[in-house]
């Protein structure tokens, strides 16, 4: 089983990774091409393109200028310990042991606007470039056109025949994967929370639930859909009535354990 998650806007650039091993991104030529495309942009250009404050735009312009194709432990950090946010709160990478991380390195992939596809321990440098950004480039008018089939081809390289691919990424990021070219069955879990008697997707909780499921798949070394359906962290449970073959639905009643 392989599974995908989104990156995050918020970055942790100071904490010490709990595992002192790393790998290198496989699409650095493409990353360099994107950096070269965006480097000439001024803070005002970036603020307009990404709808950022002047302060954030200035910070990210300096990041583009400082970005280097050669990634080392001096100028980079492993991705899984760098991204923050709701998904990564659920995943809680710092508490995964070495055996878990070894499994994650084989099974988990992080979609990225700049790096395309990252393994958990791939080194990365600080950046802000969301997949939905309309950045004109030599291959088109946005990042979806830039990446084309590059990401799906990389994913297919990792998949064994018949191996499940679980999509725990947001729509914005999974749109960068050409589903028609996938060589394996695709499973897209959905997480619903009860509010005022009705079950619905609540973004904050759904993001955290995706991270929780990624952690569950890692810790339990899940390989089948039946094993995935047993996910029961933080009060969620599989609901066969609302589920379909490719979209297992997990619900959490308001009476479930406290939501943190």
UniProtKB/Swiss-Prot annotation:
Pfam families given in the database record: H2O2_YaaD
GO biological process, one term: response to hydroperoxide
A single Gene Ontology CC term: cytosol
Domain of life of the organism encoding this protein: Bacteria
Family: Belongs to the UPF0246 family.
PANTHER family named among the record's database cross-references: PEROXIDE STRESS RESISTANCE PROTEIN YAAA, PEROXIDE STRESS RESPONSE PROTEIN YAAA
Descriptive protein name: UPF0246 protein Mmwyl1_3597
Organism of this sequence: Marinomonas sp. (strain MWYL1)
């Amino acid at each position: 089983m392989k599974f995908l998650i989104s990156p995050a806007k918020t970055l942790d650039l100071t904490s010490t990774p709990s595992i002192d091993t790393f790998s290198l991104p496989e699409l650095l030529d493409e990353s360099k091409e994107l950096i070269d495309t965006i480097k000439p942009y001024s803070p005002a250009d970036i603020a307009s393109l990404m709808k950022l404050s002047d302060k954030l735009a200035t910070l990210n312009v300096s990041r583009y200028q400082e970005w280097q194709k050669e990634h080392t432990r001096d100028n980079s950090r492993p991705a899984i310990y760098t991204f923050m946010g709701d998904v990564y709160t659920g995943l809680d990478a710092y508490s995964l042991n070495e055996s878990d991380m070894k499994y994650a390195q084989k099974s988990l992939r992080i979609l990225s606007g700049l790096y395309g596809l990252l393994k958990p321990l791939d080194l990365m440098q600080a950046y802000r470039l969301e997949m939905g950004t309309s950045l004109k480039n030599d291959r088109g008018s946005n990042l979806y056109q830039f990446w084309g089939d590059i990401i799906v081809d990389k994913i297919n390289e990792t998949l064994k025949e018949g191996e499940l691919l679980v999509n725990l990424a947001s729509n914005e990021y999974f749109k960068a994967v050409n589903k028609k070219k996938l060589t394996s069955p695709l499973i897209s879990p959905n997480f619903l929370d009860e509010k005022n008697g009705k079950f619905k997707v609540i973004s904050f909780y759904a993001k955290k639930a995706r991270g929780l499921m990624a952690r569950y798949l890692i810790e339990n070394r899940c390989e089948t859909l039946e094993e995935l359906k047993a996910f029961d962290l933080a009060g969620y449970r599989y609901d066969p009535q609302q589920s379909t073959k490719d979209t297992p639905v997990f619900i959490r009643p308001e009476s479930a354990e406290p939501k943190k």
